[in-house]
Amino acid sequence: MSNSDYAKDVLVSADWVESHLDEFQSDDPAYRLVEVDVDTEAYDESHAPGAIGFNWESQLQDQTTRDVLTKEDFEDLLGSHGISEDSTVVLYGDNSNWFAAYTYWQFKYYGHENVHLMNGGRDYWVDNDYPTTDEIPSFPEQDYSAKGPFEDIRAYRDDVEKAVDKGLPLVDVRSPEEFSGEILAPPGLQETAQRGGHIPGASNISWAATVNDDGTFKSADELRDLYADQGIEGDESTIAYCRIGERSSIAWFALHELLGYENVTNYDGSWTEWGNLVGAPVEKGN
C-alpha cells in the first residue's frame, strides 16, 4: 500500500485507490473514501467515485469553540456517513492534503486504527486523469463508537510553554513571511492574530518542504535529512504548529507517522491562539 521505507503503512497511492473503487462505492462499510477540503466547492464539482465529502470549516471543528469535535460529534459525523470503527478509511483533499492530514490526526486522536492518506491528494488525482464524478454517495448509517481521546498526539498551550522553557524542538510550518511577522496570515484567509512572529526557539520548516512538486510526500531519507538539518532527529519531544493546526498536521504526519518519531504532537491552537495571548513570548524575524 505504501513506500516500505516509511515507518508505518499509512500512505496509499492513487493507483491503489483506483483499484478499490468498487469497494469504496459499496454499502458494505469495510472501505470508505473521504475527500476533505476547506469547503466542499471543489468536491461538489467533481471527486473520486464513492468519495464522501467533508467540509473542514463546518464539519471537522466545533463552530463555537474552534476546538476539535467532541467524541460524540465525531461519532455522529462518521456514523451518519456510513463509516464504522472497523472501516478502512482513506482520506485525501485539497492543498496537498492539508485538511485531510488534519482529519487523519483527528481520526487518530479518537483511536481509529485503519486510516490512511492518499499520497498527492485531490490535485494529484485530478491532474493525472483518474476517474471523477459529481454524484454524491449515500451509505447506510453505522453505529460508530470512538475511543480515546488519545492526548499523547496533541499539544496544548501549557505544553508549548514548557517546551519553550526547556528548549525543546518546535516546528513552525508556516511561510517565512508569517514566521518573521511580516504578515499575520496567508492572503485572503480570515483567521488571524493580534501579533506577528513565532514562538521563541521555533525552527521554520515549511510544510511545503515535506512534499514534491506533485504533492506526494518526499522519501523517508529526504524527510529525515530535512528535519535533521534543524536538529530534529526524534530523540526529543517535538511540537508542530502553524496558524490553525491544519498545515502542522502535515508535519506531524511526516514526523510521527512516516518517520516513526513517537514523541511528536500537533499544537492545533497554533498561532491563532498563541499570537492572541496577552504576555506570551514572541520572536520576530528569521
Curated annotation (Swiss-Prot):
Record EC number: 2.8.1.1
Molecular function per GO: thiosulfate-cyanide sulfurtransferase activity
Cross-linked sites for Glycyl lysine isopeptide (Lys-Gly) (interchain with G-Cter in SAMP2): K162, K166
Active site: C242 (cysteine persulfide intermediate)
A Pfam family reported for this protein in Swiss-Prot or TrEMBL: Rhodanese
InterPro entries: Rhodanese-like_dom (IPR001763), Rhodanese-like_dom_sf (IPR036873), Thiosulfate_sulfurtransferase (IPR051126), Thiosulphate_STrfase_CS (IPR001307)
Record domain Rhodanese: where: 27-134, 164-283
Enzyme class: transferase
Binding site for substrate: R247
Signal sequence, renumbered to the chain: none
Keywords, in A-Z order: Isopeptide bond, Repeat, Transferase, Ubl conjugation
Catalysed reactions, semicolon-separated: thiosulfate + hydrogen cyanide = thiocyanate + sulfite + 2 H(+)
Its biological purpose: May be a sulfotransferase involved in the formation of thiosulfate.
Comment, domains: Contains two rhodanese domains with different primary structures but with near identical secondary structure conformations suggesting a common evolutionary origin. Only the C-terminal rhodanese domain contains the catalytic cysteine residue.
The name this protein goes by in its record: Putative thiosulfate sulfurtransferase
Organism: Haloferax volcanii (strain ATCC 29605 / DSM 3757 / JCM 8879 / NBRC 14742 / NCIMB 2012 / VKM B-1768 / DS2) (Halobacterium volcanii)
